[in-house]
Amino acid sequence: MAGTSQRPPSMYWCVGTEGLAVCPGPAMETHNGAEDMGSKLSLPGGSSTVQCPSMEEIHTAYKQRNLSRARDLLRGVCEESESSQEKGQLLSIAAAHGDLETVQFLLTEKRVELPTEPTDDNPAVVAAHFGHAEVVRELLESLPGPCTPQRLLNWMLALACQRGHLEVVKLLVLTHGADPENYAVRKNEFPVIVRLPLYAAIKAGNEDIAIFLLRHGAYFCSYILLDSPEPSKHLLRKYFIEASALPSSYPGKIALRVKWSHLKLPWVDLDWLLDISCQITELDLSANCLPSLPSIIPWGLINLKKLNLSNNQLGELPCVQSSDEIICSRLLEIDISSNKLSHLPPGFLHLSKLQKLTASKNYLERLFEEENATNWIGLRKLQELDLADNRLTELPVQFMHSFKSLTSLNVSRNNLKSFPDPWSCPLKCCKASKNALESLPDKMAVFWKSHLRDADFSENSLKEVPLGLFQLDALMFLRLQGNQLLSLPPQEKWTCTQLKTLDLSRNQLGKNEDGLKTKRISLFTTRGRQRSGTETASMLEFPAFLSESLEVLCLNDNHLDAVPPSVCLLKNLSELYLGNNPGLRELPPELGQLGNLWQLDIEDLNISNVPAEVRKEGPKATLSFLRAQLRKAEKCKLMKMILVGPPRQGKSTLLEILQTGKAPQLAHSEATIRTTKWELQRPAGSKAKVESVEFNVWDIGGPASMATVNQCFFTDKALYVVVWNLALGEEAVANLQFWLLNIEAKAPNAVVLVVGTHLDLIEAKFRVERIATLRAYVLALCRSPSGSRATGFPDITFKHLHEISCKNLEGQEGLRQLIFHVTCNMKDVGSTIGCQKLAGRLIPRSYISLQEAVLAEQQRRSLGDQVQYLTDRQLDQLVEQTPGNDIKDYEDLQSAISFLIETGTLLHFPDTSHGLRNLYFLDPIWLSECLQRIFNIKGSRSVAKNGVIQAEDLRMLLVGTGFTQQTEEQYFQFLAKFEIALPVANDSYLLPHLLPSKPGLDTHSMRHPMANTIQRVFKMSFVPVGFWQRFIARMLISLAEMDLQLFENKKNTKSRNRKVTIYSFTGSQRNRCSTFRVRRNQTIYWQEGLLVTFDGGYLSVESSDVNWKKKKSGGIKIICQSEMRDFSAMAFITDHVNSLIDQWFPALTATESDGTPLMEQYVPCPVCEASWAQHADPNERSESVQYFDMEDCVLTAIERDFISCPRHPDLPVPLQELVPELFMTDFPARLFLENSKLEHTEGENSILGQGGSGTVIYQARYQGQPVAVKRFHIKKFKNSANAPADTMLRHLRAMDAMKNFSDFRQEASMLHALQHPCIVSLIGISIHPLCFALELAPLGSLNTVLSENAKDSSFMPLGHMLTQKIAYQIASGLAYLHKKNIIFCDLKSDNILVWSLSAKEHINIKLSDYGISRQSFHEGALGVEGTPGYQAPEIRPRIVYDEKVDMFSYGMVLYELLSGQRPALGHHQLQIVKKLSKGIRPVLGQPEEVQFHRLQALMMECWDTKPEKRPLALSVVSQMKDPTFATFMYMLPCGKQSAFFSSQSQEYTVVFWDGKEESRNYTVVNTEKGLLEVQRMTCPGMKLSCQLKVQSSVWIATEDQKIYIYSLKGMCPLSVPQQALDTPAVVTCFLAVPVIKKNSFLVLAGLADGLVAVFPVARGTPKESCSYLCSHTANRSKFCIPDEDARQNPYPVKAMEVVNSGSEVWYSNGPGLLVIDCTILDISRRLEPYAAPSMVTSLVCSSDCRGEEMVWCLDDKANCLVMYHSATYQLCARYFCGDPNPLRDTFSVQPSVLETPGSHKTTSKGPVEECIADVSIMYSEELGTQILTHQDSLTDYCSMSSYSSSPPHQDPRSPSSLPSSLTSYSSVPFSANYEDSDRLQEPSVTSDRTEHDLSPMDGETFSQHLQAVKVLAVKDLIWVPRHGGDIIVIGLEKDSGAQRGRVIAVLKARELNRHGVLVDAAVVAKDTVVCSFANENTEWCLAVWRGWGAREFDIFYQSYEELGRLEACTRKRR
């Protein structure tokens, strides 16, 4: 046994009887047997005391269980005794018997102290001995001070371990910190082994204690293992071995994980492991004291996969004599770090599966001992090798090069002098820091170019680094700090485009070879630039591509004397370190360009060009300063001042006084807006740094009706001066509210001065008091009672108030000083140059130039009376034409525009909805005049009836303004933004200013007071600007929609009264809820209210004056009256109010700083109301009516259905009537879940996911079906009856409950309204518990599915077809939502649920989670919720957006579908938002890598920064219905070439040849990878005519009548041919025919003169013999064709095909086909598909519906496709390929002779007999060949001129359902006119198309474009590519017993038009079609298509057809 010879420590001898003193005699063994206790108790001195009889009595009483007597006796003795020693004895007795009460009495009342020495009679020792844990706790806690005496604890612990008291042991170790590794020792004693806690526990057999100790810091020592071998083994086996997670390779046995780490084992016994050695898969022996191991470890553990031996004292592992002894071949991981190995065991070299080897922190001097390593395989699977912290001097190549799978190598902190030569392995991470490396090998880029990501060669002795290090394409982190580098390789040769971190600190960069600093740094050895004089050296340069990737650059501690210029171009840099470069004195201004830089280290640099105070402020300030320098920034003192206030308050007069210092003489005209300039000099005594401030003053006045318009001129960073008339007193103060709210709404946090005029009208003696009162009123408006700023109002304090007299000018100087002081303190937040004061801020020169250009443009336009706005394109042009323009990116342009807006040069609104942000208004006066036209409309019935104007009338108002048809949409959006004209339908707008201020008739007469009424009051701190206008517009839209729904339901019933429209509320009391209808008699609306009356009740919403002092309303009052007591209308109204506030006025949902809500809802008690109505006195109302707080109602509704009113407790009020929205009474009864049928638990196992705002989604069952339940959790009171009346806690809980109810209601309502196959259906709702049930997605979210499938594939983890279908279904769902005016707002893969991953299923996904969706009432939407990364960049606070935000998210989801990855752009929301707004998008890959061209293009279109450039969901749906979308993979430009050849085998390669003689070269394209594998490889020789690949050789025919055969073995390039053959003519085509003999072929070479040469080939080499077949001879002798016949012309062989299972070869002979019988190698038959001058150009075989072989051929003149039945040689069909619109063409197929015995036999006389229809062929110079046919076909072949007259019109491709069979194309898109299959036979094809209408091309070119190029067999379909680039796809289908052909698709990629004409095409590897295009310059481009067969097309068409059908069904169901 290894390790048994070790001697135990020397103190082992100290085991004696004295050691047993800790264990009292047998008398102490039992709890009762304490009678001898007295005799054993000894004094600290050791002498026994004589026991008094009372002690004996106490013992006896305890012994007899007479506790009370014992306690009485003990207390008596205690009272009598004075001796502390005696009291100590009493404490010991009580402790021994576990009498806790007495122990507490003695400790607390008698103050008995516990001794700290561990004597036998110490009460704590005694208590521990008997195991009284509570007594021990009490005793130890009585000790004074924070620390318990360690000796006492250790003694007690050893004792408790021996006695087996686990609770005491736990208490001592866990609570009091006793150390399980410490010996129990008394004073002046030696430690004894039996007093070691673990030893004592194991010896006494206390297993549970032993395990507890081992788990809390105790270790095995050699004494324990020697003295208790079996118990030790038992413990190790039972408690430290568990079942392994790794699979077992041993049948029937459990795989084991041995965890013997951190036990300080001195040895491992072989016996411990022997019987389980076959089961061990993981063995952890780390952190022990092992000097050696038994021989079985690790070599004999056959199933071992993980071995950890780290932190031991191993000098070596057990030796093995031969490799046969090593049976641990399954080992995957070994950790042998922190040992004493001098070399690795040679046995490791035999572990062929080892993946990870950690051997750091050893004494390795050699890797392996070479002499002992014999016949080893090498660690070929090793991925990670860690050799850090050793003594290695070299890494032997013979070992390193065997590591073929190595991905990570760490050799840091060794003594390596050199690094091994690179070898072939996928190395990703290489760490070699802190060695003695003097050079690095060159060839890193050869082997690790695309793998190595992280390289660390820091702290070495490198003087230079090889170029290859910077040519590693995947390199992300390169650390070279702490070397002796003088220069780096030339940057123009770098290719490390992914580099993120480059650390070059602590080097010699900037020194020359002599050690002296150069004048100009030659840091990078690049080509020197000529400088003045003879100096030629180069600055440090970085390649331009690093600007995209490099984030961290360290150049500190070098010898640089200038910042390299290229550093300033690294725009992505976030950290730059330049410190400790003594020569660096200046920072270039260009550094300011680095917008992402947040860390700039310039420590210990003496920078002269940045002031010290700027440097102190940190990197941001330094960069801002440099940016200002770079951009030639100038101090700008121009600001915008806006003067506002009610009319006739003295605004213009005040302005003139400020400008001139004099009172004006003339009154001003009532213009709406006046603009003027004013310069204010610095007042005397001011300490401001600016001399003067210049204002662009906008004096906004005009009539009161225009007040709402004026808010559009309010912009940020302007100074607002609100002017009011002091003389008008409180009334004028009330009027201020409107202006102050307007300013805060449109320019939050603006600086506002409130200036009172007419000071002279207040009598002097009352002036001070009166002004103080008025000031208090003003402050009361905009500050809360506590003094904090009121929400919704600007921040106005007494410092912002001023008074002035415009008559005697009193206060004018003070006002000037105030304006100057306030202006100088205004901050320029969010500036590009940095946060600074607005006055005197630095503005880039280019912004100021642009300002000048804009002002000049405005001047030019006003002189020419032109329109005063710019479009975004015009502004871009203006920017580009501005001299010195340095505005480059989108963000910078936005900053420039902000500057123009802030200075009053421009007006611009960044809303993206309807493209409003694309207009820039130059002149506010002009805009005001345009708006005045609308305000000049009087409410006449002609133009605007009831305040509603038709869109065409609104357009008429634009005539003469300069707004065009292109910009009217933006103008209308502008009107809606400022509530001037709000859309109420698609073609009508509400003009709120035309509405009367009060209802036009007495509404009170309509409201009959009755009992059946409920009310709701919204009390608001302020009513936001625009609230009523938007509310009334929404109500009009909703009422109209409801009328329409009712009208649709009642289409067949006529209305009794035409003037009456029907209006429906849903929900009635019957059965909780059902549907209830009323007739809407009248709808009346005014500026702040709306009333709808109907038979049996009414509904009214109006403003309520909550506060008399606020003239503007302070709330909303809703009344709903219904004789049927159906109050669900209240839910309808409150929904509208709440959603409007949430979306447009969220400020109202906040609270004041003192916690009071800004908006509160109250419900007057209807019972009180009814009784009050009988009283006449209105003053009594407030006392007699109870107002329920909505919060109370909500909290009560959680638990009960009624609420009690304190005024009539006996009459409870039903909550269902009071707050119907909480009980969802407007929902149909069928949607309420029966709770008894809902089975769900809320355990963790059933959680499917988390929703927003704390909702949880559970898996459940309803009526036996699986469902998903979305549960809204509301916090409950423990005891709601006694809940505190008015606490903040209650308010918070109520707010939480209301939020939950509101979210629940919004989402449930939305789900209820949505019915679409791609949208998750609502199954039902429940109030108790608050939840709704949805369909359950069987496969979870798309994100989960993608992450599960993305591991194995690089693109499209779900496969191509499924990706297409899912993308289509998402777009379809979005299109439906947008049609319903719903903006999803949170589209992401988490919210897309997956139903099926089968491409055959009709529905694969559904959209879910409408928690933050927005209903858009034709007006766009506001709000910033969403998920960063998916959220469109235009979603920002206060920006109105439209449904295009969903299209941005859709683009991101497409990225996920294509890549399988989340669109990650950073970890922080701000970082992501910034990147997206800059136009940075996730990187996907080139189209040829992704291979889904259209979807990738759509993705990029969707995530365009400009919303108007994104497509609509509806247009995406229609795009994706075209099969081209799905089948077009990519196009690949291939440069100039001369010939294209495809391989006929299973390979994906095609080959181009170019040039001739010496310059002849070839290019190989791998179409599977979209890669040019070989580019222009030279292969001299003549120009090619033809090429064929046969097995591993290539046959190449050239124009000099030769065939060269090249071998392809060993992937060597084609250089020297193996063999050359001569032919009598040029070879025009090849064909390889397999022969029955293995590896034998016949190679047929068709020649230009019509001959066919036959070469037998065996094992890749042709035999000597070669035979020829002569077409001419066969024609003459066999088929009797005379020589003068045109068919006997010498036609080149253009096409050959193997037919009839290889028994025949058919080949072209001019217009005919000749058949070779392969068995006798003779021409046996001739077929006549065409007549001369046509020539067969293409030939292919495929199967028909019955699986019989058909041969298709194509010619070059008639453009006709002919089909033969190969077995009978019968011509079965013809199809003309020249139809400009071939989709849906059909042609009949004649049955073959075999099927119909009566049909005539084919002969070979001529073409006429073979025609299956009446066909004539004619040829003319003009039109070429035409086939004139008179068969029933969809294509009219009457003459070619029928195409020369009509453009190719797009047929409406609506789907139709046809009877489907296995190979029928039931899903081909058909015109809706042809509903049944019979009528499909006789379509009418119009022939009114003219050729010149088709396109710019002429007729001949047009017919050329329609010429078919080739016929291809793709699976079971025929593809016919045409010169124009489109592909006709033809299929055969069964048709009432016979067959017919049909064009099932036409594929046309418009992207290919610019690449010329389609020249050739081929099928490669059976499933891919490659078309080659060439233009006039012989530049070629490949278009690669997915080779779809009938099955794929069927799935494709059915997918959208079926979706359409399901959609229609859903609509019908509704």
Swiss-Prot record:
GO terms for molecular function: ATP binding; GTP binding; identical protein binding; metal ion binding; protein serine kinase activity; protein serine/threonine kinase activity. This is Leucine-rich repeat serine/threonine-protein kinase 1. InterPro entries: Ankyrin_rpt, Ankyrin_rpt-contain_sf, COR-A, Kinase-like_dom_sf, Leu-rich_rpt, Leu-rich_rpt_typical-subtyp, LRR_dom_sf, P-loop_NTPase. Belongs to the protein kinase superfamily. TKL Ser/Thr protein kinase family. ROCO subfamily. Residues 632-826 form the Roc domain. It catalyses: L-seryl-[protein] + ATP = O-phospho-L-seryl-[protein] + ADP + H(+); L-threonyl-[protein] + ATP = O-phospho-L-threonyl-[protein] + ADP + H(+). PROSITE patterns: ANK_REP_REGION, LRR, PROTEIN_KINASE_DOM, ROC. It comes from Mus musculus (Mouse). Residues 1242-1525 form the Protein kinase domain. Keywords: ANK repeat, ATP-binding, Cell membrane, Cytoplasm, GTP-binding, Kinase, Leucine-rich repeat, Magnesium, Manganese, Membrane, Metal-binding, Nucleotide-binding, Phosphoprotein, Repeat, Serine/threonine-protein kinase, Transferase, WD repeat.
